[in-house]
């Protein structure tokens, strides 16, 4: 019934198996990849005919994690998987980025890649297995894919690189780097690092590239057994259109791309395009060419003009040379009520970044396959349509916004203080208010400034820069601080963030079929120069975290109580802790190990809450005097609440320094009194006294009598 084919190799000390022919046989390509006991299914389906009216590759990649893969049932009312999680969105992008450049340019058939995690062994992260499985499924599917690609995760610890570190090993590594590419070149890099230098980062990329070659060979071996026949792809000859267009548009386009200001340049380019369309599609005449083909040739002409001008003259669209960074203006404290804020402007790219400090109540609970954990640092990136002078729909967070936010998160995360030293939940929001290239790196710079403005003690300020590439044959130019046009018309988006000491995040996306080690080395060196320059400009606004938190930020005090006292502080059904919060206005968080965090922007409220909690969690001391409240009056005495929730009995004989006939002659319910703890009886009941305490001053009368000097004896008579 099944015609199965499989290939198995040893990879990084664990078996990697690729199998096809048993599951999802109606898909164009389907591969089950098993690494350790992590199992992933990747499927590829492409439409039979091209999609009408599109001039781009209609590719969709969806990565999904099933709860059953980890032996779990989803939470929530419906008990099934819902909208994609952040991890699923990020891995979908991780798969998309290296495969997209390898499709034949003219492929316009709707293509969908679905990758499903079927089993997770809690050791091997499914993302690398998903990349490998997707590459294999595409290679078998018959779609015009110029792969296969391989991928690997690289760690770095004890001055050694680690291939595909397990989840436990990742806890101790200084680097989390994912690299993907073909047998000849690197296509994609994504990483977070603890301030590592350029040589270590480049070494990690090349280490990963070398060590995923066996995976590429395994996919080729599987394809030789099971690949489908290649699909036919129409080869379109646009040379006639190009020849006519050069005559009517080249000079005008060159003039347009000499305009430095983005909106003016776009208007000039738009005018040239209107002229071209009017020429090729005159009113009342049958057009010779398809509109999409003409538009595609126009875009190619734009790219050629920009690219060759840079290679031939060294001059870019806005007049800069390859290494110059645009003018930078940094401001902090721009929003009066925010805990920390910064406005970072670089040329025509601008980010307003705001930091908010919260408490344990604000931590984000992440429900992952590997288990639930709490996240105390959140970074959110927003890209509204007005930032590029356009109208658009405002709605849910887009994939791009999630991806850019995570890139900035990776850049900042390594320089944050440990949570036990700075016990706040920190949320950073970047509002991109203007964009003309590298808004994610503006977010990194603005986030660093906003965090320091809020008083978050970063290890060092962090900056980011986006690099571009123009590659024609053996000639290339690496561009620092790229514009939006240089990003769209160039061959590489290479983003590097870090401190003066090293790199904290590196992300690279290649739009061609890969780049060499030499180009990456040049780009990293040039990026360091740019990063140091940007850090210098940022230092004009702020060089380190402010000594004090913002005026409106909550203060957090941390202390410990005995674990057997946690129940008393919380109370039945949370009654006690709710009362503390309601009456003091402070926020209280108690952890299982007895760590208590009290937060409030009001110092008096914080002191009151801390005193209340400590009074409950600690034991009263015999001989000490306490303020109390009479809570119940009996014939034999009065019960007084004197130590948190603790009550004790003042026997009728201890009410006053005289004979008392009735308890109510001295006290009634609600009276505020001062009591001394005498001790505990045989049953553990608390014994209190009022008569040995001055009810006005709180003075210990018993101790006063003991300390008083003895009366001198009278002199004998006649002496």
From Swiss-Prot:
Q: Which residues form the signal peptide?
A: none
Bilayer-crossing residues are none
A GO MF annotation of the entry reads: RNA binding
Q: Which GO terms describe its cellular component?
A: cytosol
Q: Which residues form a coiled coil?
A: none
Q: Which UniProt keywords apply?
A: Cytoplasm, Magnesium, Metal-binding, Nucleotidyltransferase, RNA-binding, Transferase
Q: Where does Mg(2+) bind?
A: 487, 493
State where composition is biased (Basic and acidic residues). Answer: 701-719
What sequence ranges are listed for the domain S1 motif?
623-691
Segments of this protein annotated with the region Disordered: 691-719
What is the top EC class of this enzyme, as a single word?
A: transferase
- The UniProt record lists the EC number as 2.7.7.8
| Subcellular location field | Cytoplasm
* The protein's required cofactors: Mg(2+)
What Gene3D superfamilies does this protein's entry cite?
A: GHMP Kinase, N-terminal domain, K Homology domain, type 1, Nucleic acid-binding proteins
Pfam families in the record, alphabetically?
Answer: KH_1, PNPase, RNase_PH, RNase_PH_C, S1
Q: Which domain of life is it from?
A: Bacteria
Give a yes or no for keyword Cytoplasm in this entry.
yes
In this protein, which residues make up the domain named KH?
A: 554-613
Reaction it catalyzes: RNA(n+1) + phosphate = RNA(n) + a ribonucleoside 5'-diphosphate
Under the heading PANTHER family, the entry gives: POLYRIBONUCLEOTIDE NUCLEOTIDYLTRANSFERASE, POLYRIBONUCLEOTIDE NUCLEOTIDYLTRANSFERASE 1, MITOCHONDRIAL
Function, in words: Involved in mRNA degradation. Catalyzes the phosphorolysis of single-stranded polyribonucleotides processively in the 3'- to 5'-direction.
Of which family is this protein a member?
Answer: Belongs to the polyribonucleotide nucleotidyltransferase family.
Q: What is this protein called?
A: Polyribonucleotide nucleotidyltransferase
């Amino acid at each position: 019934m099944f015609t199965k084919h499989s290939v198995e190799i040893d990879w990084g000390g664990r078996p990697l198996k690729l199998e096809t022919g048993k599951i999802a046989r109606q898909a164009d390509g389907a591969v089950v990849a098993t690494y350790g006991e992590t199992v992933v299914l990747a499927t590829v389906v492409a439409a039979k005919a091209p999609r009408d009216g599109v001039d781009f590759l209609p590719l969709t990649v969806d990565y999904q994690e099933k709860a059953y893969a980890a032996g779990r049932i989803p939470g929530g009312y419906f008990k099934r998987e819902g909208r994609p999680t952040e991890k699923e969105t990020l891995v979908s992008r991780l798969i998309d980025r290296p495969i997209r450049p390898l499709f034949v340019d003219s492929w316009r058939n709707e293509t969908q890649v679905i990758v499903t995690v079927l089993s997770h062994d809690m050791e091997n992260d499914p993302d690398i297995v998903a990349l490998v499985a997707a590459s294999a499924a595409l290679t078998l599917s018959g779609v015009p894919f110029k792969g296969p690609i391989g991928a690997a995760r690289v760690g770095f610890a004890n001055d050694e690189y680690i291939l595909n570190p397990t989840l436990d090993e990742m806890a101790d590594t200084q680097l989390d780097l994912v690299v993907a590419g073909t047998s000849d070149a690197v296509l994609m890099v994504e990483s977070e690092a603890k301030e590592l230098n350029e040589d270590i980062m480049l070494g990690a990329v090349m280490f990963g590239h070398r060590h995923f070659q066996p995976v590429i060979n395994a996919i080729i071996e599987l394809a030789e057994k099971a690949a489908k026949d290649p699909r036919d792809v129409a080869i379109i000859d646009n040379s006639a259109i190009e020849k006519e267009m050069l005559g009517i548009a080249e000079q005008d386009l060159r003039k347009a791309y000499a305009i430095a200001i983005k909106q003016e340049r776009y208007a000039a380019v738009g005018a040239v395009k209107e002229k071209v369309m009017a020429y090729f599609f005159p009113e009342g005449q049958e057009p010779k060419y398809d509109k999409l083909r003409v538009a595609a040739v126009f875009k190619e002409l734009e790219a050629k003009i920009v690219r060759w001008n840079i290679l031939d003259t060294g001059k870019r669209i806005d007049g800069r040379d390859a290494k110059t960074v645009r003018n930078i203006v940094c401001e902090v404290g721009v929003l009066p009520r925010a805990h920390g804020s910064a406005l970072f402007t670089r040329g025509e790219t601008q980010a307003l970044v705001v930091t908010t400090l919260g408490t344990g109540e604000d931590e984000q609970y992440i429900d992952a396959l590997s288990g639930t954990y709490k996240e105390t640092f959140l970074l959110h990136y927003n890209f509204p349509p007005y930032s590029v002078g356009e109208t658009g729909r405002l709605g849910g967070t887009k994939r791009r916004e999630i991806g850019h936010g995570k890139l900035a998160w990776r850049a900042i995360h390594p320089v944050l203080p440990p949570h036990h030293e700075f016990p706040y939940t920190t949320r950073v929001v970047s509002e991109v208010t203007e964009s003309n290239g590298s808004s994610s790196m503006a977010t990194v710079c603005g986030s660093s400034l906003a965090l320091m403005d809020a008083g978050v003690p970063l290890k060092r300020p962090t900056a980011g820069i986006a690099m571009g590439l123009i590659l024609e044959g053996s000639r290339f130019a690496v561009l620092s601080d790229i514009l939006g046009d240089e990003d769209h018309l160039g061959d590489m988006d290479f983003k590097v963030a870090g401190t003066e000491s090293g790199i904290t995040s590196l992300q690279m996306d290649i739009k061609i079929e890969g780049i060499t080690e030499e180009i990456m080395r040049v780009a990293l060196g040039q990026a360091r120069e740019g990063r140091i320059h940007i850090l210098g400009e940022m230092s004009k606004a702020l060089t380190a975290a402010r000594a004090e938190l913002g005026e409106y930020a909550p203060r957090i005090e941390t202390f410990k109580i005995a674990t057997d006292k946690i129940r008393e502080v919380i109370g039945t059904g949370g009654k006690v802790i709710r009362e503390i919060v309601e009456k003091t206005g402070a926020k209280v968080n108690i952890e299982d190990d007895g760590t208590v965090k009290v937060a409030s922007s009001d110092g008096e409220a914080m002191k009151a809450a801390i005193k209340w909690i400590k009074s409950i969690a600690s034991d009263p001391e015999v001989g000490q005097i306490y303020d109390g409240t009479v809570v119940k009056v009996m014939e034999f005495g009065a019960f007084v609440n004197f130590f948190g929730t603790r009550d004790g009995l003042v026997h009728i004989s201890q009410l006053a320094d005289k004979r008392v006939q009735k308890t109510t002659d001295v006290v009634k319910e609600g009276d505020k009194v001062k009591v001394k703890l005498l001790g505990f009886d045989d049953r553990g009941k608390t014994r209190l006294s009022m008569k040995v305490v001055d009810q006005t001053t709180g003075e210990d009368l018993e101790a006063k009598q003991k300390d008083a000097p003895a009366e001198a004896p009278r002199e004998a008579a006649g002496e």
